[in-house]
Swiss-Prot record:
Gene designation per UniProt: dntB
Family: Belongs to the PheA/TfdB FAD monooxygenase family.
Cofactor(s) of this protein: FAD
Protein name according to UniProt: 4-methyl-5-nitrocatechol 5-monooxygenase
Gene Ontology biological process terms in this record: catabolic process
Cofactor note: Binds 1 FAD per subunit.
Length: 548
């Protein structure tokens, strides 16, 4: 092990984040929201210049809501995209629909979430994340590259270099989060291997202008898959229907003879021809604005942690862009990890809590890799569908129904049958520990709210209408353990009013029961009815899930 740093560092910060794209920005934002100083370094000069991730799920919007960004993100989305766009497949835009995967992006969401799915280009989202993170105190440095990283067991010493001036500085941090992409140098440095389906396609995204208003009038589609003899790919249009991009994929083995190889020799003429073939109008005017080459890959890191260095986002898992899982899963990694780092750094939790990041998020990552691969096969390459293709898990389950299993969750004795389930439909979660706290409509101070609006920074106690004793127990437990703890009694005629009468059923509680919700919005423990000693039960549960 390398000896601890002897020369004072230029900069000291609790958490250094390597990689300042969407996941790195989200990590900095969530840490700042939890009151932890964070610094992120990004080698590029500015935030994203291409759309890249664009389909954002319900859970991601709930997290953005928790940091005050839901409205501005929804407003920005509505400027460019239809709010409830569907997802279908065509032979070409002129050739008609061959399959409909989602007719309305937000059909039925009201039951499960106060938010709405949406499309927003990554280059529009990242500046919003950056602005809010900086507003909350994050230190974000662009045009800055990492020279070296040393984890000595007591902290991490990182040498960074300003690319413009060449000046090098030493940063000392308690922990480092690597969100530096699928080719993560930090993952390689840790010797962490990856496994999965591997390379699926050498791909290109063609950014273009073409007037498709007549072809797409009244469709309000968010994503359009194209399957014909010339190409396989997908469109995403802005709602002007005059600009967008076409992602083109190579199917099967990209190196096979006759494969459409978009990794070399790809000219503007090729791009125009492919866009026209996808539109289905051979002589339509097409203006090519840019072409970005990339690889569609499905793989998962063997570990999410090495010492004081954690992997998040594409550094931990990479998926093909079918289902919109990549960016969403990365943002949710960031939130889970940030909440745990905050609890450890402020002395509330034991160091062992950080081990639960991998225990909770890696199974979700594995599920997500399989589901993105399955959607790739079913939507873009159905001829490769076989018995080895993973069965589809529905979108509501993927977005809101994943469950955590770790020492930070106290599983109930009668829950053993589903104890190892990684995912289930949110309607069936019923407040089980390890599941996301369900959305329930409330009336608070004459305002319509969601129970999710009561969560977000600290542990929260949610008790049924006859559970005032739990609120009193929470006050005493908070003092004994020295941690912030909010408590709410939810009922038809309480200050936090259950306007639809759903709270008890949604959380699986009697009128005197209680649920303990973690700062990341997941249920840590519950008592379905009144305990013999509520204060002892709650205090013991908190000690356990905090790994004290």
């Amino acid at each position: 092990m390398t000896r601890p740093l002897e020369t004072p560092p230029d900069i000291e910060v609790p958490v250094l984040i390597v990689g300042g794209s969407m996941v790195g920005l989200s990590t900095a934002l969530f840490l700042s929201h939890y009151g932890i100083q964070a610094m992120a370094v990004e080698r590029h000069e500015r935030t994203a210049i291409h759309p890249r991730a664009g389909h954002f799920h319900l859970r991601t919007l709930e997290l953005l809501r928790s940091v005050g960004l839901e409205e501005v993100v929804a407003r920005t989305s509505a400027e460019a995209f239809f709010p409830n766009g569907g997802i279908n497949a065509v032979q070409s835009l002129a050739g008609g629909e061959t399959a409909s995967f989602i007719s309305n992006l937000n059909a039925g969401v009201e039951e499960f979430s106060p938010t709405r799915r949406l499309f927003i280009a990554q280059q529009a989202l990242e500046p919003i994340l950056r602005s809010r993170a900086e507003e909350l105190g994050a230190d974000l440095r662009y045009s800055t590259e990492v020279v070296s990283v040393v984890d000595d067991g007591e902290g991490v010493t990182t040498v960074i270099r300003d690319k413009a001036s060449g000046q090098e500085r030493t940063v000392r941090s308690r922990y480092l989060v690597a969100s530096d992409g699928w080719r993560s140098q930090r993952r390689a440095q840790l010797g962490i291997e990856t496994r999965g389906q591997g390379l699926l396609s050498r791909s290109a995204t063609i950014y273009f202008r073409a007037d498709c208003r007549e072809l797409l009038a009244g469709t309000h589609l968010g994503v359009i898959y194209v399957l014909n003899e010339r190409l396989r790919g997908f469109f995403r249009f802005e709602k002007s229907l005059q600009s967008g991009f076409l992602g083109v994929a190579t199917l099967g083995d990209p190196t096979r003879p006759g494969a459409l190889d978009v990794s070399a020799g790809f000219t503007t003429d090729t791009a125009v021809e492919l866009v026209r073939a996808a539109i289905g109008v051979p002589d339509i005017d097409v203006e090519i604005q840019d072409v970005a080459h990339w690889e569609a890959t499905a793989a998962l890191a063997d570990r999410y942690r090495g010492g004081r260095i954690f992997l998040a986002g594409d550094a931990a898992h990479v998926v093909p862009p079918y289902g919109g899982f990549g960016g969403n899963t990365g943002v949710q990694d960031a939130h889970n990890l940030a909440s745990k780092l905050a609890l450890v750094l402020d002395g509330t939790a034991g160091e062992a809590l950080l081990d639960t990041y991998e225990a909770e998020r890696r199974p979700v990552g594995a599920l997500t890799v399989d589901q993105a691969f399955s959607r790739y096969i079913r939507r873009l390459a159905p001829e490769f569908l076989d018995e080895q293709t993973p069965e589809l898990v529905d979108d509501f389950s993927m977005e809101l129904g994943y469950r955590y299993h770790s020492p930070a969750v106290l599983t109930e004795d009668d829950d053993k049958a589903v104890d190892q389930a990684v995912v289930g439909h949110p309607r069936e979660a019923l407040g089980r520990p390890g599941s996301r706290a369900p959305h329930v409509a409330l009336r608070v101070d004459d305002h319509d709210r969601s129970v999710l609006d009561l969560l977000g920074r600290d542990f929260v106690v949610l008790a049924g209408p006859a559970g005032q004793v739990w609120a009193e127990a929470a006050e005493r437990a908070s003092k004994e353990l020295g941690l912030p703890l909010s408590a709410y009694v939810v009922g038809s005629d309480t200050p936090v009013a259950d306007v639809e009468g759903r709270f008890a059923d949604a959380y699986g509680l009697s009128d005197a029961g209680v649920a303990l919700v973690r700062p990341d919005g997941f249920i840590a423990w519950r008592s379905r009815d009144l305990a013999e000693d509520p204060e002892a039960a709650l205090t013991d549960a908190l000690r356990a899930v905090l790994c004290r």
